[in-house]
Amino acid sequence: MTNIKILPPNSVNDPIMKLMSSKTKTRVLFKAPLLTQSGYGVHARQVAKWLLQFRSSNPDSIEVKFDPTSWGSTPWYVTATEDEPVIQQIYSNTIKAAGEPFDISIQLLLPNEWTTDRAAVNIGMTAGVEADTCNPLWIQACNKMTMVIVPSEFTKKMFFDTAKKFNMEITVPMVVVPESYYVSGQDIWAEASVDKKLEAVDTSTNFLIVGQMTGDSFLNDRKNIGYTLRW
């Protein structure tokens, strides 16, 4: 597969490496909306590529299994595509028994969906919310995990500000790992054409919307694109 690397800080690897060094083969479960056509799905497949590459480099020390979940009403990939060849590998490594025990679970979900009953080490990953406050129950959810990974300093600040607002405390490590990766030997911006398209716009007042319509009506579209276009 293409040599794709995700670049986490060393603190992300510490609990994983500590456990792996004490076992012959470490079983890792990655639970996420891996097969959905969504932003979380794209992020999940980036992480899956890194896990599969790590397994390929360390076949005797790590076993990787996937637990695909839904993401709202977004559609699923059922076959591998040119853009997402990892789809077939995800299907081939999907868990068959719901109660299988694992050493490490990585869960790319909303915090209220995280669980701690599948593994000894449980790592929560989430983008949080695009706001300055979240449900305080999410702070409790964070504290149940071994550690939490977020994609931005904004999200991390949101969690800590929420904890302070409700007289709570985040008691587990929370680290920032951007949702980015590079392909070795390639300039990921080399073929970007968005600048040319923007330069071709000849109107003076313009709005750029980035998102996916996720509902079957304006009322249940969580990105609110329908009303954005109407208004």
Question: What are the roles of these predicted feature ranges?
Answer:
Residues 25-26, 120, 205:
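Nucleotide donor/acceptor-binding cores
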